[in-house]
Curated annotation (Swiss-Prot):
Name used for this protein in its record: TPR repeat-containing protein slr0751
A GO BP entry: receptor-mediated virion attachment to host cell
PROSITE patterns: TPR, TPR_REGION
Keyword terms: Repeat, TPR repeat
Mapped TPR repeat ranges: 61-94, 95-128, 129-162, 163-196
Repeat listed as a keyword: yes
One GO location term (cellular component): cell outer membrane
């Protein structure tokens, strides 16, 4: 079965104002000044570590946030965690920053920290969809599909056009043996994204488990040809192998 879909790093902060004037906020020089003010300071530099100064630039949090996104997208997840933590020192009520730090934690394999940050993001803005989907994926990886379904369903409630939530919920229904619900969700995915081949492939597997062999054969054969048309030979061969294993 093709795996769940996640979300990428959020690229910008919301327009919410920071709770305090930046001139009154203290942050750590080695990280914040290096990023926000462009000073080339190392954390281990004598006389610098632990020194506290005032950042007076009104764009500093946005600049640090942008550097965190850049670090995360480059795969430097530990650095991204540090940068987003600095932003949260300035604005602890930023759902996007908690989400991004959660994603960095997730990429580092720190699932508990990731789930905690996704939870904080949701608590700050219950209508912000990405943390529901990513947290649901983590629950799914832990085989806690019932809790995962709750997160995916909440995402769908707030945004009925979020195809990733339907797709991931379908996968959890599949893992629970609830094949009719899985097929229904794959159908919804294909209404929103008719070209999403993985949903057709997974629906074919669900049809097979539900005893609907003709529909299963049709979906798997269609997905195999679609993969080939896109130049994805590996997925093409996988679909053919799956049909052979299932006797289709």
């Amino acid at each position: 079965m093709k795996v769940n879909l996640g979300n990428c790093f959020c690229l910008s902060l919301s327009q919410k104002k920071f709770p305090l004037p930046l001139a009154s906020l203290l942050v750590n020089v080695p990280l914040a000044l290096m990023v926000a003010l462009g000073m080339n300071l190392a954390l281990e530099r004598p006389g610098v570590t632990g020194e506290m100064v005032v950042l007076e630039s009104p764009i500093a949090p946005e600049a640090i946030f942008a550097q965190g996104v850049k670090a995360g997208e480059a795969g430097n997840y530990a650095e991204a965690v540090e940068l987003f933590s600095v932003v949260l020192n300035l604005s602890p009520d930023s759902p996007e920053t908690h989400y991004n730090r959660g994603l960095a934690w997730e990429r580092l394999g720190n699932v508990d920290q990731a789930i905690a940050d996704y939870g904080r993001s949701i608590a700050l803005d219950r209508y912000y969809i990405p943390p529901y989907i990513n947290r649901g994926n983590l629950y799914s990886q832990q085989q806690d599909h019932h809790t995962a379904i709750q997160d995916f369903t909440q995402a769908i409630t707030y945004d009925p056009n979020r195809y990733k939530a339907y797709y991931n919920r379908a996968n959890s229904y599949f893992q629970l043996g609830q094949y009719a619900q899985a097929i229904a969700d794959y159908n919804r995915v294909l209404v929103l994204r008719p070209d999403y081949i993985n949903a057709i492939y997974n629906r074919g597997l669900a049809h097979f488990q539900a005893g609907q062999l003709d529909s299963s054969r049709q979906d798997l054969l269609f997905s195999a040809q679609a993969y080939l048309n896109r130049g994805d030979r590996r997925s093409y061969l996988e679909a053919l192998d799956q049909m052979s294993e299932l006797g289709l």
